[in-house]
Structure formats: C-alpha cells, structure tokens
A protein has these predicted regions:
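An interfacial alpha-helical scaffold signature
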Residues: 1-245
Length: 245
C-alpha cells in the first residue's frame, strides 16, 4: 500500500511539473499510487441493505454537480464526516471499481480533484487521462489566427461524435494560431460554447478523448470555453465552426 504522505508528495510533484511530458509522468505516477493506497469514504450511519454498499454524496456549490467524496487520509475524512457520517476504508482501486458511474472528488476540502466516470475507467485500465495546463494570452501579445492549414478531420470527427452525446455543448470552433517570433510557433485553438456548469467536465473529458483517440497527435492545442449567453470571442470567427449552429 502507498502511504498518504507518498500520495500527497506525488500530487505535489504533479502540480509543480511544467513540461508536458513531465506532467504526464507525474500524473501517471500519482494515479498508479492512488489505486494502491488506502482511501476513505463516507457512508450513512445506518447499515445498508444486505449485499449492498451505500456511499454519501454531495452537491457541489460551484456547479450543482453531484459528486462522491473520498479522502487520501483518515484525518480529512473524519473532519468532513463530523458526527453525521461513518467512515469506511478500502484500497483506491476497490473504491473506484465499486463506485463506477459516479463522479468522484478526492479531498474536496483541500485538493478538490474531480474524476469523471470516463476518467475513472481510464485510470483503472492503467491509461493516462490527458493533461492540460492553464495559459494566459496577454492583450499586448501579437497573435495571428486563421482556419487550420493542417489536416484536422480526425480531430473534428472524434469531437463531433462525443459532443453529439453532450447536450450542454452548443458549438465548437477550431482556429490555427501563429505566435512567437515571426509568428513561427503554430498551434491549434479549440473554442467551445458550453453551459457554464459543465465547463470543468467538458474540459477534462475533451482532453481525455483526444489523448485516447489521437495518440500520435503532436501539435499543441489550447482550449477556451465560453457560456452560451456570452458574446462569442472574436478569435472564434477566425477559424472554422465544426459543430453546432
């Protein structure tokens, strides 16, 4: 079993990593250790029906999603449980297997790591879930934008297939960006119009879908999500719309 301290150290390493490959290795190491760690979850005080296991869930105040909390150490679990919930300990792999189909949140009062069902399936299968980092384009930066000049049919086909099952995705755009000295740094920009409560979920799932289906994709890809009631960013109009109306 991996200790709670080791798990926290691996999480810290993943958050401090910078380069893409370094982040992937750190996150893979963290989730591999999570499966082998003892984790803690909340269950009702009253006993469950014979042959069944019941877990406590809560509704996130930030987006209204129902999540099942679990914890990497007993102290966090006890603090959150108070006197109204019981605590159960089990291996991380066992918890993920028993709660398949639920959205999980690791250490909701500290780390707030949301794991959606498709990500849980990937972790249990020993696969990477996809990696992203936040980036800021300043107003002073000169950026060129145009429709994609490289083949993108595989990318847009995969995303259209998945977005068709997500009613919260209203539209999707793809733009080619030119940045850096002489605009020589080329990347793709994916713009999504998504209901605000589902921004996090669609960001994480889109990253997973692309990681799983396009293993040989090498061009950097940035993602920006905006709400349906917001004015569409001008940069969206510089590329192509491949989904929605």
């Amino acid at each position: 079993m991996a200790s709670a301290k080791l798990l926290q150290d691996l999480l810290q390493a993943a958050r401090q990593s910078t380069g893409h490959d370094e982040i992937v290795r750190a996150e893979d190491a963290f989730f591999k250790a999570l499966l082998k760690s003892t984790v803690y979850a909340h269950v009702p005080l009253e006993p469950p029906p014979p042959g069944r296991m019941r877990f406590v869930q809560f509704v996130r105040p930030d987006n209204g999603q129902t999540v099942l909390p679990f914890f990497s150490d007993r102290e966090q679990a006890e603090f959150a449980a108070g006197n109204v919930r019981a605590i159960i300990a089990m291996a991380g792999r066992e918890l993920l297997e028993q709660t398949r189909g639920a959205t999980l949140m690791l250490n909701p009062n500290v780390d707030q790591i949301a794991l959606y069902p498709a990500e849980v399936d990937a972790i249990l299968a020993g696969q990477s879930i996809g990696t992203f980092s936040k980036e800021v384009i300043t107003e002073s930066e000169q950026v060129g934008a145009c429709p994609p000049s490289c083949p993108t049919d595989a990318l847009t086909s995969i995303l259209r297939e998945h977005f068709a099952t997500e009613p919260w995705v209203r539209a999707a755009y793809l733009v080619e960006l030119h940045r850096g000295p002489e605009f020589a740094d080329i990347s793709l920009f994916l713009g999504l119009v998504v209901a605000g409560a589902h921004h996090e979920r669609l960001l994480q799932l889109t990253t997973l879908w692309l990681k799983t289906a396009l293993k040989d994709w090498s061009m950097p890809l940035s993602i920006l999500l905006c709400n349906p009631d917001e004015k569409l960013p001008e940069i969206f109009h510089q590329g192509i719309q491949f989904y929605g109306t």
